[in-house]
Amino acid sequence: MKRFKKILLIIMVIGFLFAGFQITLRFLAEQRNKMVEIVADYKDFSDIALQLNIPEKEMANKLIGSGVTSIAISEERLLDMKDEGKLLLYSGVDLNYLNVHFNNEYSSLATSAKSYLDNNLIPYSNVTLVLGNNEDTYNFLINSFKTRFRGITIDFKEGNNFCILINRSMDKVKNVGLGLTDEDFEEATKLGFNNIIPRVENHEGITPEEVDSLYSQVKKYKVRTIIFAGVTVFGQDYQDEKEEILKFIGEKFSQTDAEIITAIIEKPAETDLETIQRGIKSLSKYSNYVNTKVYSADLAQLQKLTYEGLVEQWGRAISQRNVRILYVRPLAKAEKTVSENFENTLKAIKEIKNRIKYMGMELGNAKGLGSVKQNRYFQLIMGFGIISSGFFLLLIVFEEDKLKKFLKAIYILYGIILLGLMFVYLILPVYNLFGDLANKLLALIATISFASIGGVWLIEYSERCRELKDKSNIKEGILLLIVSVLVAGIGGVFVGAILSDSKYILKLDTFRGVKISFLLPLLIWGFAYVIKIGLFKDSNNKPLPLLEQCKKLFETQVTVKYVAIAGVFLVALAIIVMRSGNTMVSSASSFELTFRNLLEKYLVARPRTKELIAFPILLLIPCLAKFKSREWSFIAMGAGMIGIENVINSFCHIRMPVFVTTLSTIFSLIFAIIIGSICVVIVDKIKEKF
């Protein structure tokens, strides 16, 4: 059995070396992606300029001076064009009052439209009329309506005057995106920003010719990034089951040396991005992940947040969620004037600009992440290492004499699992079908096995410390803490490596096993404690058999004190589990948020709260282990397990950069050594007195 254990260790080491190489590739890809772009919404700030009665150019200069690098422009809409004086917009029912609404240069066209509706028995209430006298506007609308309102429009012309009937009610057409005009780009160019970002909207029946036209237009104005507007990406069509248009767009926009980056909207952790913009996963895959993530505070946040709070939101998005485009809209607090909200928005932009530089990043045009290459043969070797860790855990939990009769079955099971992995990873059609599932299962096994190995180490080292009465509690505590974190870190590297595909980094796919990986290692640790130390012992001070211990436990009379302690423990555990993973249910308290914000302001990577609490407790274990009663060391180990699990949990947040995850744990260790050492001195003093 010792030989088998050595073989498992060797395979784990080899797997870890390959995992280290893979996670290094991911780290290098993330390090190349250090350009942050600050984008202002043109319409929002144009409205602010109008309310403050200042020229748009002056508004633009203020934004650029604060740190804004780019301006986002939205597609034309009938309602906006009406407000800008480019056209007139009427509901069909207005034709009932010709003399009131059309007693002008358009009266003849309106009469023709009315006759057409009457002759074709079309109800006025189902119709919208668009009128104007500009040839460029007419040509733009006709070309746009051919695709947006295919087959439901008819137009009338007299000289430059035109009337276009749309066989849809006003509510259904007034806010439909109609595309971008050259005039929109030229006006934005004059404002002096480095980059123009069009907000492109989807519509049914997009053709390759339309894609080519859009690509030519954005290239003409040196556009580098597109952010999709609406609930579907440009090209998403339910009737296009083979996704031919999405594939065409993805390949077109990701051409080498001529790529247009498509931005992915960043939303809360529990939100599936496909529900925000349908088609984004497929388009990202077809564009070889030449994508970046964009974050914008929503209206509810803008109405609530102070400028400091907005900066914290932006900073967290950049450092912890790999966001590289900040989409800026003005603060909108009701108790502030428009001018005050605008000035506070400028303050927030200046503050985040400074923080971006403090993080070691640069302001400029965002770059696409690109494809982080994964080699399935490397994944196979990592898989061997992860499976070996599970069997290694089995061998260190149970005593050798208890496993002897099962050794043959263990060897056979181990071989079957390795053969199964080879079948999945070596046969390409099988890998294409089940590779993702296999990677997620292996990641789940790694989170459970390495956290549990760390838990078993706590038990064994704690027992060893009981016999070392004269040794330094601080040195022993630091050793225990570092080894525990290293074991967990190895598991984290396996997880971060096997899930280092671009789709996980961009959060187009998610690892959902974090809550299970929090609970199971705790149960395994408790099980190992009962087997190795025992809640009940025989006359030789050896742990009773498991079933006998369970029987005695159920027969034990329990006081209210222990019920209360158990209740507190279960509530705390429930909160921790709900707040773990990629689908957080329970939020942090206002005090914790304030503390987090303070740490994030001065540290590039904030130590995670659970680690800040659990790591110092881990350092206390050797000191507490020397108490006659094992109760305190047992409680400390249980609390310390949360910290060990949290190290691996941090790597499960794949969208968080590897550098930030690692640095966060290092900061937690530094704080823990300082705080924990002080606590050890205090506990030692208390022991001397009592």
Regions found by a protein language model. Give the residues of each.
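Alpha-helical transmembrane segments of integral membrane proteins
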Residues: 2-18, 22, 384-690
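Membrane-interface motif at the C-terminal end of an N-terminal transmembrane signal
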Residues: 15-35
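Soluble extramembrane regions of membrane proteins in the secretory/endomembrane system
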Residues: 29-376
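Large, well-folded core regions of big proteins
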Residues: 328, 341-384, 391-426
